[in-house]
């Protein structure tokens, strides 16, 4: 049906990245090879800063470039988190400085403490360990002997836990490194 509609483009989007990927890359799925994937990358830092700075200035407030850069790096340019933190900074400070950033992120993470505790409690002990290993190793070299020995976990147990977390879409993998999809949850785990 979609193939027969003229002059209409379709956009498939959502938060279930692996389901969307499978729709177009699994040869048994009906949309196999029928779309061009487009990954939305973080907003470039300079452009994002110009936007945020303008919004602060409109209300007579300031945010330094140094503080914005620190925020952007801490949250890996994740748009919703940058905006959320900036909103709270704007609410609480006339002039945002670098030293305001980390405490504000911790405060925001603490607001979700009950949710994150409940979520974390639903994971098996091995999955909890896997999440902590991801955080402590920045997602890289998780299956190295050093990491396995340091965390007293077998390779098969860690691989199994990682696969479950991937299936649940709690984590994802890119360039041979794992990362936690919810950056604020990752910061809460720290």
List PLM regions with ranges:
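Amphipathic alpha-helical "lid/sensor" segments that cap RecA-like P-loop NTPase cores
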Residues: 49, 53-115, 173-175
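Small/polar loops that bind or transfer phosphate-bearing groups
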Residues: 11-12, 40, 181
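Sensor-1/coupling segment of RecA-like P-loop NTPase cores
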Residues: 1-28
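Conserved AAA+ ATPase "SRH/arginine-finger" region at the nucleotide-binding site
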Residues: 36-47
